[in-house]
UniProtKB/Swiss-Prot annotation:
Binding residues for a nucleoside 3',5'-cyclic phosphate: 135-252
Biased composition, class Basic and acidic residues, residue ranges: 1227-1237
Domain PDZ, first and last residues per copy: 385-470
Tissue specificity comment: Expressed in the brain, heart, lung, liver and stomach. Expressed in the granular layer of the cerebellum. Expressed in Purkinje cells. Expressed in cortical neurons and coronary artery smooth muscle cells (at protein level). Expressed ubiquitously in the brain.
Gene name, Swiss-Prot/TrEMBL: Rapgef2
Domain remarks in the Swiss-Prot or TrEMBL record: The Ras-associating domain is necessary for the Rap guanine nucleotide exchange activity. The N-terminal regionis necessary for cAMP-binding. The PDZ domain is necessary for its targeting to the cell membrane.
Protein name, per record: Rap guanine nucleotide exchange factor 2
Residue numbers spanned by region Disordered: 40-59, 68-101, 1003-1052, 1093-1127, 1139-1159, 1224-1256, 1304-1369, 1390-1496
Keyword Cell membrane part of the UniProt annotation: yes
Gene Ontology MF terms in the entry: beta-1 adrenergic receptor binding; cAMP binding; GTPase activator activity; guanyl-nucleotide exchange factor activity; PDZ domain binding; phosphatidic acid binding; protein kinase binding; WW domain binding
Summary of the function given for this chain in its UniProt record: Functions as a guanine nucleotide exchange factor (GEF), which activates Rap and Ras family of small GTPases by exchanging bound GDP for free GTP in a cAMP-dependent manner. Serves as a link between cell surface receptors and Rap/Ras GTPases in intracellular signaling cascades. Also acts as an effector for Rap1 by direct association with Rap1-GTP thereby leading to the amplification of Rap1-mediated signaling. Shows weak activity on HRAS. It is controversial whether RAPGEF2 binds cAMP and cGMP or not.
GO biological process, one term: establishment of endothelial intestinal barrier
Amino acid composition bias (Low complexity), ranges on this chain: 1025-1038, 1110-1124, 1140-1159, 1440-1455
């Protein structure tokens, strides 16, 4: 087993290492004081607030808060701006991610436990993870569970390690959890095994031997191993546990004995496979405790092996006649109706089955069951819309209606002509008509309803099956016939005008759903009672919110009357003015029950506001509910305007302005409801006097309306956009029937044809292209950056709404190539958002089967509603389907169907909210402190957010009467967002997007935007490899260019080469013991390898922690787009680490100087404080290449940050290499200096300058201001005669001579402003002395001599190797240095041409040492190695104890020998080119074996 990481002794990552982190988690940005310099900053102000758990509440907390505290809230007008202002943007919107994105890797924790310590929960976690792997396909659950209980976890650190040799004895069965291995067979053939594949023994105790040699292909390969003995025992045990059911000599069913836990209490037989007939019969047999979901699983999946549901239906009707089976049959039917009512709706045969079953229940006097069945039908029935046309108004209606508000019912269809269009449209007996042509029919007199239906030739009707109440209506009518007197409501009368639209009383759930039909005399809409209630309400100001909205109702318990609120209670007058529930026996009463179960309708609370105008343009705000009619609004408006006339003289008119400027005016029907939802942004409601014909809206007002209705994304609140996206997504998500997943997966033909599923599937593409379209259509660069920033904030709010689908779509949109290439736009984005973006996309790191995302999803505090990432759902289901056979031995593989059903149930639970989703997504506003905007059409949306104080909920009293204007503005913003989203014009064609992208930023270079994280462009020679961190991206290689030299300058901006997996130290292959040296057995081999890796880790704690400092900044190799575009967000602590915008791995934030046409600045002040011991500089004056070497030792407590020198230290050594390029000095010509500056300017992504904010737009200016003015030695003479190494080794003596004043100046500056932008722009001057060569090879970065010979100096391999000597012939130099800015502008013309900067050398593309390089032209055929190979090579770390002698050069793993292993290269002493430096050596080369030395 892989031991846990040793406790950190540096105090920075100790928190993290208490438990071993998985490979990909250690790459997350941890906020545990990674940078001591920013430890005083609260998490709310740190750059990475998304990972800070500063006590901010998760949605579930807020939800609970709303439940318990709703009654205490005071809602008096609280200030809130409708749109996020720039000021709060950075402060508030971003700082309250609901919980950290990083969570523990639970699976890893379980694996690392000793098998005997694993609990049942641990095994369940492992089972959940393992069942998706192909290796476990076709195994039964019990086998998997047993294997999970005994598996041992092993990690092999390094790529290229031999796991098994040919002919070795095998002693385990292993499955790959992460990474891949390659098996090379003796005949030369090779096979690659990747995640989920298995290798090793078969389930027998015979000796087996390895065929071929197995090597790891990548670092950090993870395996689980099961010893041969255990594997054999478990797989052979299966047969013993099997129970076969035979009929007529044939096996018809196979069951397996299972124990679900170790207590022995949950054990029994579970169906594994069987014939379709036998499985159907099992529905009414006894089910064991270990198979509680058989009926649900069967009812969901029968469609995969039965051609028609009637096959089951007929059997059930048959079995119903057997008294012993009757209860079981009834239970099956109730579950069927409750879970899959869509099987019955629209299927005439199944509808007849249901009717026959109801008749059977009535016949057997099973009233309770019948009642439950009717309740389930009513609750599960969905609204259906249909359109009917009549040839003329006089044409008779093709159906007969019953009911009406005078009887206390809705309008019901009693019968339909069988040959009419209505039947074809799907209208049937028992349907309740809810709406006709937009007019609410839930509370209307029958005569009025008939009049509306007769007077229209075009009828758009919304209906819903409601047999439960329809039967109640029929019973009432038959009673009336018998008694001869109509039933009259006893309490009050039904004058509509007396209805108040302000709720009368806070209601308990029982009251909401307790409008039971027991007391049939009651009327919900009473006058006397309501007036009393109104007075009470006015006096007491009781909150309008339910104290516990639906908290006490269990969702899945629909079979119990008391649960659905239909218990026999004394009548409680309806306190809610729900116009649909005007009678206790009204059909929609069921909707109160329905709300608990489904919430497709919402309680009638006045959570909406209308703004009503008069002809003189005065306006008033009127509080209404969703069901308030136009007539009621007129009554309220008359009261608000203090008009004396009667309501009959006035009507409500809608005035709207078309985009062409045409003013339209129409009178609204009195019964029209949902008024707040109907009004357009370009429309207004007017109170119109019917007697007058005045113009309601002048032309000026119309123009203003038109202007208001034109909206752009930047005008919209990011919170509101995220809320509306979430509501829209959630509506689509929860409408998906469980059967649609099955139909889609098994490609079954169904009535619905998976329409809801397809819609939800399309949303992710639409949202992705929306992001790209919005950004690329904006021509202004600054606005483009703001739109990107806006989208990052929207994604963040989607994260808070637990809308992972939209979050992923937005991230994908920002990563689309046409958006990703907008280099200068991304550079303007503030670092904070870069960091947030990286954190957001880090969540979707695909490694280990999306382990991070799955961890968050399975987190304890993630309660519904959740909108999961749909592609992952689809992948999991496809995996289960394709990884397991549907039939085994001719029998239906029910184990497979059970797993699929379980997965679908799990997905369904995410949509099972017991509160209106609009409210759930709505309870978040900035800082949780201001008035929550109320949803358009959401009932309880007035439940407010909770002020957060140190993570504790602060209870605040608020008045229950809301500030209507504030609510209106909120609703108006919601309306704007809705209109914006509904009118989106998407550009779905990637070629068109690319064209738009090129119009925004023409291609000045073929490179991707920031290599640090824009998507790499594929080239023939360099396959794009996964990115390993903020600084590491595959760069396009110039096919014919030899590897480009790369040089380090400073340790100040440089972390010693770090590994990608900090907690797993890499060591050179030569230091590894032979694989399996401790044991001839495979299981122990993998484990021993894993343990040796950890021993290395303990030995190299120092290096390890350095690794951590940098790796914390890197994100997983495969994350969608893994890094900030401008280097590290570490610059927060005042560092200039963000220079390295190159393709070098995060292993060197240090980067190539020559290739980047820039010099790092070297920290010289605070040497003791930073423990920077000394540096060595060698300058190759003949080549014109300045090289500076820095050797550093850092004390343990400084590891994580020591190497990130603060900006204040980095100023001193500017251009030092230019001064001391040899024992004498050389004049820096104007031409060279200026070219250096310009090359840096034009280097695009290759240079450090591209990192600094805004530096690209006016690079010359910056260079002018920063570069030259900061040279304090424009015409200074130096008479220092010591040799160069002496100067550097002296701890910065020369620096102090040269730069003491400027160093202090910058120290002061930096302490006074910690602004990122300034730090970055100041940083840009450090890169201006780039090429020292006479000539620069345009796009390759190869330095040429004047004589035309290429010299490819050795590139850094980002590894810990000793300093090497370089070729440098002493050239006499005048002691005069002239540096003037005068010629900076002279070279601008050359900027776009051949002096464009090349892509920087990717890590691991190691150059050929000068000593090996033949004189003469370069070899065009020489190609770099595969990027992956180079990357792995770049992680080889030389052990400090083996630092070679001063004369040695670093490993010469050259680009032309991709297969070679690192080896020490000993240059020939006789090589004349090395002569000048041979005797000199390095002053401090052997001074301290622990020092980290950078390679050049």
């Amino acid at each position: 087993m892989k031991p846990l990481a040793a406790p950190a002794n540096h105090g920075v990552l100790g928190q993290q290492e208490k438990q071993s982190l998985p490979a990909d988690f250690t790459k997350l940005h941890l906020t545990d004081s990674l940078h001591p310099q920013v430890t005083h900053v609260s998490s709310s102000h740190s750059g990475c607030s998304i990972t800070s758990d500063s006590g901010s509440s998760s949605l579930s907390d807020i939800y609970q808060a709303t439940e318990s505290e709703a009654g205490d809230m005071d809602l008096s007008g609280l200030p809130e701006t409708a749109v996020d202002s720039e000021d709060d943007d950075d402060e508030e919107d971003i700082e309250r991610a609901s919980d950290p994105l990083m969570s523990r890797d639970i699976v890893r924790d379980c694996l690392e436990k000793d098998p005997i310590d694993r609990t049942d929960d641990d095994i369940e976690q492992l089972l959940e993870f393992m069942h998706q792997l192909p290796a476990f396909a076709n195994m039964t659950m019990s086998v998997r569970r047993e294997l999970c209980a005994v598996m041992v976890f092993a990690v092999v650190e390094r790529a290229g390690t031999i796991v098994l040799n040919d002919g070795e004895e095998l002693d385990s069965w292993s499955v790959i959890l992460n990474g891949s291995v390659e098996v090379t067979y003796p005949d030369g053939k090779a096979e690659i095994l990747c995640m989920g594949n298995s290798f090793g023994v078969s389930p027998t105790m015979d000796k087996e031997y390895m065929k071929g040699v197995m090597r790891t292909k990548v670092d950090d390969c993870q395996f689980v191993c099961i010893a041969q003995q255990d594997y054999c025992r478990i797989l052979n045990q299966v047969e013993k546990n099997m129970q076969k059911v035979e009929e007529e000599g044939e096996i018809v069913m196979v069951k397996e004995h299972r124990e679900l836990d170790r207590t022995g209490t949950r054990k029994g037989h579970i169906v594994i496979k069987g014939t379709s007939e036998r499985l159907t019969m099992h529905l009414v047999e006894e089910h064991s405790v270990v198979d509680p979901t058989f009926i649900e699983d069967f009812l969901l999946t029968y469609r995969t092996f039965l051609s028609s549901p009637m096959e089951v239906g007929k059997k059930l009707l048959e079995w119903f006649n057997d008294p012993s089976l009757r209860d079981k049959v009834t239970r099956v039917v109730l579950l069927w109706v409750n879970n899959h009512f869509n099987d019955f709706e629209g299927d005439p045969a199944m509808t007849r089955f249901l009717e026959e079953f109801e008749n059977n229940l009535e016949r057997e006097k099973m009233g309770g069951h019948l009642r439950l069945l009717n309740i389930a039908c009513a609750a599960k029935a969905k609204r259906r819309s249909m359109t009917l046309t009549k040839p003329s108004r006089e044409a008779p209606l093709p159906f007969i209606l019953l009911g009406g508000s005078e009887k206390g019912f809705g309008i019901f269809v009693d019968s339909v002509d069988s040959s009419s269009k209505a039947t074809e449209a799907g209208l049937k007996r028992g349907d309740q008509i809810l709406e006709v042509n937009g007019q609410n029919f839930e509370n209307i007199q029958l005569s009025k309803a008939m009049e509306i239906l007769r007077n229209n030739t075009h009828l758009s009707i919304t209906v819903k099956t409601n047999l439960f109440v329809f039967k109640e209506l029929l019973t009432r009518l038959s009673e009336e016939k018998r008694n001869g007197a109509p039933h009259l409501p006893k309490i009050g009368d039904i004058k509509k005008a007396s209805r108040y639209s302000i709720p009368d009383l806070a209601v308990d759930v029982e009251q909401v759903i307790g409008l039971e039909k027991v007391n049939k005399k009651s009327k919900a809409n009473t006058v006397g009672g309501r007036n009393k209630l109104k007075k009470i309400l006015d006096k007491t100001r009781i909150s309008i919110l339910p104290q516990k909205p639906y908290n006490d109702i269990g969702i899945g318990q629909s079979q119990d009357d008391s649960i659905v609120g239909l218990r026999q209670t004394k009548h409680i007058p309806a306190a809610l003015p729900v116009s649909g529930t005007l009678s206790s026996s009204n059909p929609d009463l069921l909707q109160s029950h329905h709300r608990i179960l489904d919430f497709s309708t919402t309680p009638d609370l006045p959570d909406q506001v209308l703004r009503v105008f008069k002809a003189d343009q005065q306006s008033r705000y009127i509080m209404i509910s969703k069901d308030t009619t136009a007539k009621e609004v007129v009554i309220q408006a008359i009261r608000e305007f203090a008009v004396t006339a009667t309501p009959e003289q006035y009507s409500l008119c809608e005035v709207s302005v078309t985009p062409e400027g045409v003013i339209k005016q129409r009178r609204l029907p009195d019964q029209l409801s949902k008024l707040a939802d109907r009004i357009q942004l370009s429309g207004r409601y007017y109170l119109k006097n019917n007697m007058e014909t005045e113009t309601l809206c002048s032309d000026e007002d119309a123009q203003e309306l038109l202007r208001e209705s034109q909206i752009s994304l930047l005008q919209l609140s990011t919170v509101e956009v995220a809320t509306q996206l979430s509501m829209r997504n959630f509506e689509l998500f929860r409408n998906i029937e469980p059967t649609e997943y099955i139909d889609d997966l098994f490609k079954l033909k169904s009535k619905t044809s998976c329409a809801n599923l397809k819609k939800f599937e399309e949303v992710i593409n639409q949202e992705t292209f929306w992001v790209a379209s919005e950004i690329l259509r904006e021509t202004n660069q600054l606005k483009r950056m703001k739109i990107i920033k806006h989208f990052i904030k929207i994604a963040l709010h989607c994260r808070e709404c637990k809308n992972f689908n939209s979050m992923f779509a937005i991230i994908s949109g920002l990563n689309l190539a046409p958006v990703a290439r907008l280099r200068t736009t991304w550079e303007k984005l503030p670092n904070k958002y870069e960091k947030l973006f990286q954190d957001l996309q880090d969540l979707f790191d695909p490694s280990r089967n999306m382990a991070k995302y799955r961890n968050v999803l399975s987190g304890q505090n993630l309660q519904p509603p959740v909108i999961p990432l749909f592609p992952v759902i689809k992948k999991d289901l496809t995996f289960l389907h394709e990884g397991n056979d549907s039939k085994v031995d001719g029998l239906v593989n029910f184990e497979k169907l059970r797993m699929i059903a379980k997965e679908i149930r799990h997905v369904g639970r995410m949509a099972s909210v017991n509160m209106d989703p609009a409210l759930m997504f709505r309870t978040r506003k900035k800082k949780w402190r201001s008035l929550g905007s109320l949803s358009q059409g959401s009932a309880n949306a007035t439940v407010l957010d909770v002020a957060q104080t140190g993570g504790h909920k602060k209870r605040v009293r608020r008045s229950s009467f809301l500030n209507a204007k504030k609510l209106y503005e909120d609703a108006q913003m919601a309306r704007k967002v809705k209109q914006y989203l509904s009118n989106l014009e998407l550009e779905m064609d990637e070629e068109s997007l690319q064209t738009l992208s090129l119009q925004c930023e023409p291609a000045t270079s073929t490179l991707p935007k920031n290599p640090a994280d824009r998507k790499p462009v594929k080239s023939e020679t360099s396959p794009v490899a996964p990115r390993a961190g903020p600084q590491q991206k595959a760069q396009p290689q110039q096919p014919l260019a030899p590897p480009q030299p790369s040089h380090k300058v400073s340790q100040g901006l440089q972390v010693p080469a770090v590994s990608l997996y900090p907690s797993r130290k890499k060591v050179p292959v030569k230091d590894l013991p032979p694989f399996g040296i401790n044991s001839p057995q495979a299981l122990k081999k993998i484990l021993s390898l894993s343990e040796e890796g950890s021993l290395e880790r303990h030995r190299k704690q120092a290096e390890d922690t350095i690794s951590n400092a940098s790796s914390q900044l890197s994100s997983p190799p495969t994350s969608p787009q893994s890094s900030p575009r401008k280097g590290y967000a570490l610059a927060l602590s005042g560092t200039v680490d963000n220079f390295s915008d190159s393709g070098h791995s995060e292993i060197s934030s240090r980067s190539s100087i020559v290739s980047n046409s820039s010099f790092d600045s070297v920290p010289v002040s605070l040497h003791d404080e930073r423990r920077q011991r000394h540096s060595v500089s060698i300058v190759e004056s003949n080549l014109g290449v300045g090289r500076m070497e820095r050797r550093t030792l850092m004390e343990p407590d400084q590891y994580s940050l020591g190497s990130y020198a603060p900006v204040s230290e980095s100023r001193g050594l500017y251009a030092a290499a230019t001064v001391i390029s040899s024992p004498s000095t050389e004049e820096l010509s104007h031409d060279q200096g200026d070219r250096a500056s310009l090359d840096a300017a034009d280097s695009g992504r290759g240079s450090w300058t591209s990192c600094s904010s805004g530096s690209h737009d006016n690079i010359q200016t910056i260079q002018h201001q920063r570069s030259w003015e900061t040279l304090p030695f424009g015409h200074t003479h130096f008479d220092y005669s010591g040799d160069a190494t002496g100067i550097w080794a002296s701890g910065g003596h020369m620096d102090q001579i040269m730069f003491s004043d400027h160093s202090t100046k910058y120290n002061r500056q930096n302490q006074s402003r910690e602004s990122l932008e300034q730090a970055q722009s100041r940083a840009s001057w450090a890169s201006s002395t780039g090429y020292w060569g006479e000539d620069s090879e345009g796009d390759t970065g190869t330095i040429k001599r004047r004589g035309g010979k290429d010299v490819s100096t050795e590139a850094e391999s980002s590894s810990m190797v000793p300093v090497t000597t370089e070729e440098a012939k002493p050239v006499p130099m005048p002691a005069h240095i002239a540096v003037t800015p005068s010629t900076t502008k002279g070279l601008i013309a050359r900027k776009e041409g051949r002096y464009r900067e090349p892509p920087p050398t990717p890590p691991g593309y190691v150059g050929i040492p000068i000593a090996d390089f033949p004189e003469g032209p370069c070899h065009p055929a020489r190609k770099p190695p595969d990027y992956n190979v180079a990357l792995q090579r770049s992680r080889m770390v030389a052990r400090p104890t083996e630092a070679p002698a001063p004369g040695q050069t670093p490993p010469a793993a050259t680009a032309s020998r991709p297969g070679s292993k690192p080896q020490w290269h000993k240059p020939s002493d006789a090589d004349p080119r090395l002569a000048p430096f041979q005797p000199q050596g390095f002053a401090g080369a052997e001074e301290d074996e622990d020092e980290q030395v950078s390679a050049v």
